Every structure is written in structure tokens, then in C-alpha cells.
Design a protein with these regions (language model features):
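Acidic, metal-coordinating helix/loop segments flanking the phosphotransfer/catalytic sites
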Residues: 18, 31-49
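Negatively charged, flexible loop motifs adjacent to catalytic sites
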Residues: 13-14, 34-37, 57, 82-87
């Protein structure tokens, strides 16, 4: 499998997500803590999968997902706690 990008500010979540993606065959997932940095990295590298773990320190995270869908060919997974999901409605 190709490369994966994890956009998440949570250290424990990052380790867990990276370990699961590695088990699935993704090579060394890249971990980015902010939406702004994630957008920059998406223009510099090709990723097969992008996982956004919301919220991010500089934004909620759905904006990164929309940007990824519009500007990359990667699959996108958006993780959000049920209690925070209402912010998207």
C-alpha cells in the first residue's frame, strides 16, 4: 500500500492510528498536528489515505477533509467524537 497522512493533535491517538495503518500495510504514516500544515503537505506529497482526527488546534477538521477530497485522489477518513458531531450540522 501507499503512504498515509494522519492529521491529529492527540499524541496517544496518533500512535494508535499509525500502528493500525502500519498493520494494514501503509508505509510509515506521516503525522501532522494542524490543518494548515496538512494542506501544505498534501501539495508536496501524494498520499493514498488521509485520516483527520478532529478537532485540530487551528480548526475543526472538516475543512481539511473537504480540501483533500477536492485536491487529491486520496481516500479520506474523518474521525469526530459524537458529542462534537453536532458542530457540523
Amino acid at each position: 500500500m501507499g503512504r498515509a497522512l494522519i492529521v491529529s493533535a492527540g499524541a496517544s491517538s496518533n500512535e494508535y492510528i499509525a500502528a493500525r495503518l502500519t498493520e494494514m500495510g501503509y508505509s510509515r504514516p506521516v503525522i501532522i498536528p494542524s490543518g494548515a500544515e496538512a494542506r501544505r503537505r498534501m501539495t508536496e506529497s501524494d498520499f493514498e489515505l488521509i485520516v483527520v482526527n478532529s478537532p485540530l488546534p487551528d480548526e475543526f477538521g472538516h475543512e481539511v477533509c473537504i480540501n483533500a477530497v477536492e485536491k487529491t485522489d486520496a481516500g479520506v477518513v474523518f474521525l469526530v467524537k459524537a458529542a462534537q458531531a453536532e458542530q457540523l450540522l
